[in-house]
């Protein structure tokens, strides 16, 4: 991940440094510079949210180097010092805010399928909302999410929600990568997600049955996505999820979701819960959002939780809504929470549905939940575990002589 992020940063730096002298219209060059700034800001947000603990825990902890100019083989070996997590977030936010000056408000990737990867004005607002939330800039997170929702407030209905999360034409999607027969590289990141469609071959992305059983209220149509069954090729009896399904099974194609409006609603309510005088608004927003995910005939209960209890309810709503979309680890880190894993034992049944017994006539139980319930060192899962973070690669430590010249190497890695 480190190399992927810095490759994108270096490419963005090259565009920013050279676009003014490139051929093309001034309008195109200005917009492209804005998109390069937004891309760089997005990459720095990814570094800050994965290589350091929460900014609220250790704002001055070492995180990652900040490069603002294109590098080459010489400058790369000279290296630059790693900045703190607060500095990396500040850089990310500055790049994204600068991009607002370059990407016109009326620029949209529209409905052309092959343009969905482009960062348009709406996508930029979404990136600002997400990054502000991660950086604990609650007012900015609220305002940017609200601005994005003014442009696109659409929320999927039940039919759309069960359509497979595989098509950029979905009106709730704000950003995505299309996959076609001519350009199918994005689909490679979808393969592991579809564990239920005939013709799919991966079996790894299964849900925690305890999460499903304990947290979805009656009438929540999202719960219908989770089914107890056998993974492809009948390998394991697990809690499967039908959320992600190939759009074209024969060619194993599916569009890749990067951002949607539901995330903006969740950002807005979480930010509101942190802001003075907006707690009641956060409660109403949460109730309204839950109502959208209920089947006809059901009514969401009023939200009465306050303070930390309200935040925990919002975080759980994020888990339920954004499951499998790449947010859970980041949320655990930034909210200083613990991974929760436990077994889920059920009565084992044979092919005819009869209880299986051992040689002594005892009912046989099987675990359909997690098989790994401890950290790699054998200890219990805890908040702020080093195992939740990605580590600065050893290659960077060996090749960058200035890496820890500004902020010391974390004692966790010594």
Protein language model regions, located:
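Inward-facing hydrophobic residues that define packing positions of alpha-helical scaffold repeats
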Residues: 9-12, 89, 96, 145, ...
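Aromatic-residue-lined binding/catalytic grooves and analogous aromatic/hydrophobic interfacial grooves
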Residues: 97, 121-155
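Hydrophobic-face positions in mid-chain alpha helices that act as interaction patches
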Residues: 118, 142-261, 296-301, 307, ...
């Amino acid at each position: 991940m480190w190399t992927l992020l810095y490759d994108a940063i270096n490419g963005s730096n090259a565009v920013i440094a050279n676009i003014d002298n490139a051929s093309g219209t001034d309008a195109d060059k200005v917009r492209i510079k804005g998109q390069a700034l937004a891309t760089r800001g997005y990459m720095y947000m990814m570094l800050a949210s994965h290589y350091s603990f929460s900014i609220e825990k250790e704002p001055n902890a070492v995180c990652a180097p900040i490069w603002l100019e294109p590098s080459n083989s010489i400058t790369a070996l000279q290296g630059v010092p790693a900045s703190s997590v607060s500095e990396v977030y500040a850089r990310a936010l500055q790049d994204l805010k600068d991009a607002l000056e370059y990407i016109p408000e009326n620029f949209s990737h529209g409905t052309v399928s092959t343009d969905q990867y482009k960062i348009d004005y709406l996508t930029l607002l979404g990136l600002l909302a997400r990054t502000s939330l991660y950086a604990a800039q609650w007012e900015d997170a609220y305002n940017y999410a609200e601005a994005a929702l003014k442009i696109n407030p659409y929320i999927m209905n039940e039919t759309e929600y069960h359509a497979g999360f595989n098509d950029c034409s979905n009106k709730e999607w704000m950003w995505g990568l299309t996959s076609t027969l001519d350009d199918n590289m994005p689909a490679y990141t979808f393969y592991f997600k579809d564990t239920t469609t005939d013709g799919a071959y991966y079996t790894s992305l299964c849900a925690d049955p305890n999460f499903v059983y304990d947290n979805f209220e009656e009438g929540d149509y999202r719960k219908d996505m989770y089914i107890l069954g056998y993974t492809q090729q009948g390998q394991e009896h697990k809690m499967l999820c039908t959320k992600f399904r190939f759009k074209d099974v024969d060619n194993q194609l599916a569009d890749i979701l990067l951002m949607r409006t539901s995330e903006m609603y969740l950002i807005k309510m979480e930010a509101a819960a942190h802001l003075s005088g907006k707690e009641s608004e956060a409660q109403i927003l949460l109730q309204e959002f839950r109502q959208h995910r209920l089947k006809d005939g059901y009514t969401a209960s009023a939200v009465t939780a306050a303070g930390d209890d309200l935040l925990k309810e919002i975080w759980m709503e994020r888990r339920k809504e954004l499951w499998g979309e790449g947010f859970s680890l980041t949320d655990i880190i930034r909210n200083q929470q613990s991974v929760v894993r436990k077994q889920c034992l059920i009565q084992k049944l044979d092919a005819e549905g009869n209880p299986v017994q051992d040689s002594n006539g005892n009912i046989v139980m099987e675990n359909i939940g997690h098989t790994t319930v401890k950290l790699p060192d054998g200890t219990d899962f805890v908040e702020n575990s080093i195992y939740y973070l990605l580590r600065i690669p050893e290659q960077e430590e060996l090749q960058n002589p200035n890496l820890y010249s500004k902020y010391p190497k974390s004692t966790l890695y010594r």
